[in-house]
Amino acid sequence: MRLRNIPGAEAALREYPTFVDNPLFYKGNWKERFGNNNPIHVEIGCGKGRFINTLAERHPDINFIAVELKAEVVLRAVQRTEYKAIPNLAFVQYDASKLTELFADHEISRIYLNFSDPWPKTRHAKRRLTYKSFLNTYRQVLVADGELHMKTDNENLFEFSLNQFAAERFQMRNITFDLHQSKLAADNVMTEYEERFSSRGQRIYRVEASCVIK
Amino acid sequence: MRLRNIPGAEAALREYPTFVDNPLFYKGNWKERFGNNNPIHVEIGCGKGRFINTLAERHPDINFIAVELKAEVVLRAVQRTEYKAIPNLAFVQYDASKLTELFADHEISRIYLNFSDPWPKTRHAKRRLTYKSFLNTYRQVLVADGELHMKTDNENLFEFSLNQFAAERFQMRNITFDLHQSKLAADNVMTEYEERFSSRGQRIYRVEASCVIK
């Protein structure tokens, strides 16, 4: 997502109780931050924040963490919380390729990848969030039966991702080429991007993949 | 494929040296029929026969068997052989759901499914050639590292098949949503149906799946 640079975004973030200024401090101890042992679900790249905010409302027994690289993007998402302290929601500004700095081995239960950058050029394949090096990072921080839930409107990224999941021995499930016309539509929480693109007739692809320990 | 009923098709078939009139006789002994121990590749549903005839020409070190239910369809395909005896090619008229009557356990190395009937109605899902009961039959007759190669122009059948392969623990590879634009196009042998449909701009989906013994 492209946003204007927002001067002072990083300072502004610290005003929000759901923003975690010192995320490395919680590695291996996120349960302390949340004050309970509930499962932790992570969204990588939070867009405008509707998805993670909605899930946090719907599932008070799950702890949600949004990990997003750009301060301006985190700020847009965290603004939805209106300075409220939401006990099961946290926003982190960090590089997703370094998830192992944020989370101990097997500390989290699920990862959401929503409309990640497709990086269409072959020479940028390693930057795609389903490239095998990312999958191995996810496997490290996810519990043994942990899951990845991926949505995209980009067919090439979807095709690439299915092949990566298969090659890295992730167990796939609920593969759909048209989420909004599928039986999974009822429980689907749309991101802002998803709503805009699907309203133009763009189909949404989705897959769940669980890490089968090699 | 729909064809007019051809009177006397079954009798006509017996005139062709590549047609095997008594296929059950060879169960477990197809190497006797071919006179060698070369790997056996099977096409289920042979269409007009170009695919299997072309593969047999290109790969003299592989034995090919086309299994097709309808006598009229087998006849059209076998007519391409022009009454020649082709040492590594055999045509069989038989029901693919009964492959275990034709082949001993682990007797064959590869199965091709080309443009199988999509059976679009949900209540007919069990008839699709990638339904789990078929996959378990294939697993039984295929060698341990045996492969299924599937092509289709039907997106719903492809989506269904990917889910079946995943659920039945087949290891997928080379998943492509547009075969003719992919790196696999160079080695692709087009069926008659494929040529006709792709010339109209219809995309071809393809996947390889190998049976990982449970």
UniProtKB/Swiss-Prot annotation, chains A, B:
Pathway: tRNA modification; N(7)-methylguanine-tRNA biosynthesis
Recorded GO MF terms: tRNA (guanine(46)-N7)-methyltransferase activity
Residues where substrate binds: 121, 153, 191-194
Transferase is among the record's keywords: yes
Catalytic residues of the enzyme: 117
Example of a GO cellular component annotation carried by this entry: tRNA methyltransferase complex
Gene3D superfamilies: Vaccinia Virus protein VP39 (3.40.50.150)
InterPro entries associated with the record: SAM-dependent_MTases_sf (IPR029063), tRNA_(Gua-N-7)_MeTrfase_Trmb (IPR003358), tRNA_methyltr_TrmB_bact (IPR055361)
EC number(s) stated in the UniProt entry for this protein: 2.1.1.33
Pfam families per the UniProt record, alphabetical: Methyltransf_4 (PF02390)
Reactions mediated catalytically: guanosine(46) in tRNA + S-adenosyl-L-methionine = N(7)-methylguanosine(46) in tRNA + S-adenosyl-L-homocysteine
Binding sites annotated in the UniProt record for S-adenosyl-L-methionine: 43, 68, 95, 117
Entry keywords, A to Z: Methyltransferase, S-adenosyl-L-methionine, Transferase, tRNA processing
NCBIfam families xrefs: PRK00121.2-2, tRNA (guanosine(46)-N7)-methyltransferase TrmB
Similarity section: Belongs to the class I-like SAM-binding methyltransferase superfamily. TrmB family.
Function summary: Catalyzes the formation of N(7)-methylguanine at position 46 (m7G46) in tRNA.
Name listed for the protein in its UniProt record: tRNA (guanine-N(7)-)-methyltransferase
Taxonomic source organism: Brevibacillus brevis (strain 47 / JCM 6285 / NBRC 100599)
Name of the gene: trmB
